[in-house]
A protein has these predicted regions:
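N-terminal prepro-regions of secreted/extracellular proteins
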Residues: 1-48
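Solvent-exposed serine/threonine-rich low-complexity stretches and specific carbohydrate-binding patches
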Residues: 31-33, 81-99
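Noncatalytic modules at the cell exterior or secretory-pathway interfaces
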Residues: 53-59, 105-121
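Short amphipathic, basic-aromatic surface patches that mediate peripheral association
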Residues: 59-66
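Short, surface-exposed beta-strand/strand-loop-strand elements in extracellular ectodomains
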Residues: 67-84
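Edge beta-strands of jelly-roll/beta-sandwich modules across compartments, strongly enriched
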Residues: 68-72, 112, 121-135
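Predominantly extracellular/luminal cell-surface or secreted proteins
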Residues: 77-81, 118-120, 134
Length: 135
């Protein structure tokens, strides 16, 4: 006999109310400290949205970066927690506020994605910045 929790609760007069999960904004400080080609030591982890829809990432408060960010842009390497590349990555680089939209490609609620911020191999400086995820 298969017992269903939903049916058992209904039998007790409990009505299930399922709300769509939401994610609070998360601010993560990440730092790529050394020159050319450095990858941030601190990964930026974020759950995907419920359907795998893109999440907005804002890069703000750039400091100590290369004097020529147009020629030596930052890059973002997005991976699943298992290390596989995430699909659908579209990003804008430079200084100021930039955006990165990424789609899990899986659409599974609860998947984690890890972004590591990297400086360009031609850069002569590292970068310090704040990353804000907005689902």
């Amino acid at each position: 006999m298969k017992l269903s929790l939903k049916k058992a609760l209904a039998a007790l007069g409990v009505v299930a109310c399922v709300a769509a999960p939401t994610f609070a904004d998360t601010v993560v400080y990440s730092n790529a400290v050394s020159a050319g080609g450095a990858v941030a030591k601190t990964p930026v982890a974020k759950k995907s949205s419920v359907t795998g829809a893109p999440a907005l990432v804002q890069f703000t408060a750039f400091a100590n970066y290369d004097a020529n960010p147009s020629a030596h842009p930052l890059t973002v390497r997005v991976r699943t927690q298992a290390g596989a590349p995430a699909t659908g990555v579209v990003s804008a680089y430079g200084i100021g506020t930039c955006t990165l939209y990424y789609n899990s490609g899986y659409g599974n609620y609860g998947d984690y994605y890890v972004a590591r911020i990297a400086t360009n191999t031609g850069s002569n400086g590292g970068a310090s910045f704040t990353v804000k995820f907005t689902p």
